[in-house]
Amino acid sequence: METGGLSAAALANGDLGSQRERTLVPERLQKREHERQLEVERRKQKRQDQEVEEEKSDFFAAAFARERSAVEELLESGESVERLEEAAARLQGLQKLINDSVLFLAAYDLRQAQEVLARLQAALAKRRQELQPKKRFAFKTRKKDAASATQVASAPDAPAAEGSLTSPPPLKEEGDFDSSWICGFSNLQSQVLEKRAEELHQQDVLLTQLRNCTIKLYGNPNTLRLTKAQGCTLLCGPVSTSVFLEDCSDCVLAVACQQLRVHTTKDTRIFLQVTSRAIMEDCTGIQFAPYTWSYPGIDKDFEGSGLDKNKNNWNDVDDFNWLARDVASPNWNVLPEEERRIQWD
């Protein structure tokens, strides 16, 4: 009887086990099918995203080429102020197109576009100078010699031979603007130097061979270069295109721009607003923080510069001397928050 009872119990348990397995099989199949559907959807979404990115890149390439061609044609035949102003307006549009495309453009394509834009900006500045050099520098409130309109202004109370720059040093990359570098300071030490909006508007500014100086640029330059500076503080309003920094040490900068390029520079802090990215090469001890300088009228200068004040990639830095993507570059770091509290004025 017991044997029969055990056999019956075993059979009953076996039936229950089989029933449980039959119940679990559909659950496993359903789970597997659900995972398969999720994977299909993920791949589909990935394909769609890729197609959207390709469409955006194609649109950018076509729009950029069209506007570039139009600007080049205007500059080649720019025998009137009106045509040059049209070229300037189109360049502002090109700049906005680049700014709006930063997130989906490949790094190489972005650099190429920025270099083309910088060259066109330089060509525009040169054509403006050729067409109306006197009118460009005839400021009503200035009390300088007429001769000073063709050279870089010297600092207050500094001899003209010391503070003015008549032949800028050779530039090593796309910033080679030659005679358009006609605004700035040079060969000065331990001075406070300033330029206002009417002097800076869409100018190419060159600051070179300065030591222990504080430079304040209240306005909207086209480009800005600081070279061979030591122990200087540079505060600048929004720069429409690029800021170049080279051969500098122990400096502090507050700059807003479309692109920042830093070469052969060390032990420098940069408070940055940049709509694309910062690029550095042959540098050490560089620290980055968000741009915090302000002055009356800066919002208007941002508007005129074409920069998006709400877009800031201050910590998106390409170090050309550091190719390892999974390890942070030892040549730069983010400035700690407790060290960012600076009273600029």
From Swiss-Prot:
PANTHER family in the cross-refs: TUBULIN FOLDING COFACTOR C, TUBULIN-SPECIFIC CHAPERONE C
Organism for this UniProt entry: Bos taurus (Bovine)
Gene3D superfamilies the UniProt entry points to: 2.160.20.70, Tubulin Binding Cofactor C, N-terminal domain
Compartments (UniProt record): Cytoplasm
Record's compositionally biased regions (Basic and acidic residues): 18-50
Modification sites for N-acetylmethionine: 1
InterPro entries: C-CAP_CF_C-like, CAP/MinC_C, CARP_motif, TBCC, TBCC_N, TBCC_N_sf, Tubulin-bd_cofactor_C_dom
Sorted UniProt keywords: Acetylation, Chaperone, Cytoplasm, Phosphoprotein
Subunit structure: Supercomplex made of cofactors A to E. Cofactors A and D function by capturing and stabilizing tubulin in a quasi-native conformation. Cofactor E binds to the cofactor D-tubulin complex; interaction with cofactor C then causes the release of tubulin polypeptides that are committed to the native state.
Protein name (database record): Tubulin-specific chaperone C
Family: Belongs to the TBCC family.
Function statement: Tubulin-folding protein; involved in the final step of the tubulin folding pathway.
One Gene Ontology biological process: protein folding
Modified-residue entries (Phosphoserine), positions: 80, 167
